[in-house]
């Protein structure tokens, strides 16, 4: 089990201290991180570190965690690094929270053993979250039927085709009852900050965000926003810049002549660029 060495704790603010003083006695909450082969290192590390920082800022052990996985030995993340696991897929305590850590090629790594384990723990009433592509084994196990969920944008189309019974959204994270899902990347931070706020108040969650230099905390109302080149399927710097300017000035549109001048081309060149790549005028 991973626990914080409290000798490493830094000071917390008097405001946070006052908030936590109203919470005694504090019950420690344990998270079981289930690492699935090729899991996203960013999504996983973001979630664990949010818990670590919460402990540090509170100067007490609010959270503990352990790392589990099929086989219980070692497992590789998306960066190719091997992680030593604390154990195999065991039966957990009823007040534990499960975090399924997915990554690339999740379809190939959602084994029958993992799916059966997910179903069993869901029947026992444990809250289960899927980080990055962790929503896939959750849906495959049937525990997202009729639930709202999200998944990384690369997997959205295939997921919606395979799991029509899941209400898929483009949100950065979703919390629907005992089921939680994230879109990957830093969206793990947003989910963990919500959990920390629900458990111990927004002051502590904000203190954790500040430590992570995370200035814009997102909610489940925020959607995955892709870059202009990804959305339009074209890697053309000037075209991307023009579209970005158009999107930020919807209420007061900029004329094509000014747009063209701002990116160093003529209006006619801009019109040709739009027709060539987007089959439309500016």
What is each of the regions a protein language model found here?
Residues 171-213:
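Conserved anion/nucleotide-ligand pocket segment
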Residues 1-128, 136-141, 193, 197, ...:
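Extended, subdomain-level signal for the structured scaffold at the beginning of enzyme domains
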Residues 28-30, 148, 178:
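Residues that mark the start of a beta-strand
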Residues 69-71, 87, 153, 172, ...:
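Residues at the C-termini of beta-strands that transition into short coil/loop
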Residues 145-173, 207-208, 212:
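A conserved active-site-flanking secondary-structure segment within enzyme catalytic domains
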Residues 128-129, 150, 169, 180:
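Structural detector of well-ordered beta-strand residues that form the stable sheet scaffold
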């Amino acid at each position: 089990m991973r626990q914080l060495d409290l000798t490493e704790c830094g000071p917390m603010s008097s405001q946070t201290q006052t908030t936590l003083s109203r919470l005694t006695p504090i019950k420690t909450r344990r998270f079981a991180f289930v690492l699935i082969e090729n899991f996203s290192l960013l999504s996983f590390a973001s979630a664990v570190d949010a818990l670590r920082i919460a402990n540090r800022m509170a100067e007490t052990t609010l959270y503990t965690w352990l790392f589990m996985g099929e086989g219980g030995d070692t497992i590789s993340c998306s960066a190719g690094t091997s992680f030593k696991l604390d154990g195999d897929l065991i039966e957990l305590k009823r007040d534990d929270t499960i975090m399924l850590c997915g990554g690339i090629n999740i379809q190939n790594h959602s084994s029958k053993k993992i799916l059966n384990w997910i179903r069993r723990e869901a029947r026992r009433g444990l809250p289960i979250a899927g980080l990055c592509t962790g929503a896939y084994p959750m849906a495959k196990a049937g525990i997202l039927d009729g639930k709202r969920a999200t998944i990384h944008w690369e997997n959205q189309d295939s997921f919606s085709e395979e799991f029509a019974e899941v209400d898929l959204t483009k949100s950065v994270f979703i919390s629907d009852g005992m089921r939680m899902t994230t879109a990957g990347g830093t969206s793990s931070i947003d989910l963990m900050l919500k959990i920390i706020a629900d458990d111990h108040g927004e002051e502590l969650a904000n203190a954790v965000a500040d430590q992570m230099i995370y200035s814009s905390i997102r909610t489940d109302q925020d959607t995955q926003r892709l870059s202009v080149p990804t959305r339009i399927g074209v890697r053309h710097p000037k075209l991307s810049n023009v579209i970005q300017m158009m999107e930020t000035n919807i209420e007061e549109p900029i004329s094509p002549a000014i747009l063209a001048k701002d990116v160093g081309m003529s209006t006619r060149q801009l019109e040709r660029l739009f027709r060539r790549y987007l089959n439309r005028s500016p």
